[in-house]
């Protein structure tokens, strides 16, 4: 029987599985900590895996308005303090990747390694305009209006057709978002990569940057540019996958995560 612990600390709902060096998983916009269910089984035999709901997501409280990246960084710090963690590995997906970069810059002593999955970096004006158009759609029509296009960006057509249950699950996560808070956090996602791009060269911990070959919004080029800026980083591009490749082909991501952590923690 799995030893799974759940808790809530100062408005943040979290779960913990496994034993060993601590690894904290930080999810992306519009979903929740359950997105990591495809990674837990691979990571928990060797690591203490902690995953939580971001502010405004899942079972955690809403953020203050206006939303700022610093709020989400502070949430992570509060959680680490509440769990008595002095230092850990951080894995961030999409918005989560932006959050853990911010955290690593502000609290370098608390991060021993960093993994950035499918995370935007230095968008062009046209790329940012495209994301902001989706923000406007969410503002005018609510989270549900963004769901179908998101699933198309996130998964291959073949995988979507063969896995309707997974599509329904993730669709329900998107639709469950607060219609007022969701667009506010979406706007943060659309804009905050700009504030980070010139400072990430100060990140010194070992860093793995990964994305899918076909993740158009968080492209291989973005990952390669980011990895070139961070002194102790490398980029890996996973063939044939879109934004949520870690769900479509978990093993492709999980094997690389485990190998990287074993290399860092040995």
Task: Please tell me what each predicted stretch does.
Residues 1-23, 45-47, 258-266:
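Alpha/beta-hydrolase fold catalytic core
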Residues 12-62, 79:
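Conserved HGGG/HGGXW glycine-rich cap/lid loop of the alpha/beta-hydrolase fold
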Residues 125-129, 144-201:
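Conserved alpha/beta-hydrolase catalytic His-Asp/Glu region
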Residues 203, 209-211:
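Short beta-strand/loop motif that positions the catalytic acidic residue
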Residues 213-218:
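Acidic catalytic loop of the alpha/beta-hydrolase fold
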Residues 233-266:
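Catalytic active-site module of serine/aspartate enzymes centered on a nucleophile-bearing elbow/loop
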